[in-house]
Amino acid sequence: SAGTLLVFPEKAYFIIDFRYIEKAKKTVTACEVILQDKLYEQINSLIEKHGAKTVSVNVDTCTLSELIAYQQKLNAEVIADTKLAEIIREIRTVKSQEQIDKIIKAQRIAEKGFAHMLDFIRVGRTEKEIQLELDYYMLKIGAEALSFDTIALSGSNTSLPHGVPSDKKVESGEFVLMDFGATYDGWHSDMTRTVCVGKPSDKMKSVYETVLTAQLTALDAVKAGMSGKAL
């Protein structure tokens, strides 16, 4: 949630404020960690040290106000570089085996959370109770945090893509939708599952099976190099 990364051909620096400096020094290994004091003066000092004439800013993470401040206060030409953002996205797209293993671990925690909820969800539970129980259980079994605010919705509320859990109680014959994920060592999982409490109607079965068929078709077709649009 904070920090400024500067990458020069010779060396990289991570400038971070006092709240996170201790953790950064323990976890950041690819660059020199610097305690933030007077940020723009510190950046200018590094620009001068490395003889940089231009600074490219990642437009994916830089706000307009930050960009204007850089342009006004840095002793170099500041470029809002869309190409830099593309390069960073490409680098992040391909994961190392270590990163993949951590994502898998995060997903396994979420899967165990879902399995736990199958016994917890019943008629009379509120959406908030379902959300809180799922959050608590994932944290209990190893999640360091939640990937995002857990969504737990029931009945007609399940049509809301990013609805907020309410005090609505689950009724028999309703769908319950859960969108959730766990974080493990900085890596996130994300999954959505829908269950029915009681006996589903024929229409509910049809809708569920239609979505399931589409999912299985996509899983069978997906391959390396395929675009999301083609899939």
Walk through the language-model features, giving the residues of each.
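Active-site neighborhoods and metal-handling regions in enzymes and metal-associated proteins
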Residues: 1-231
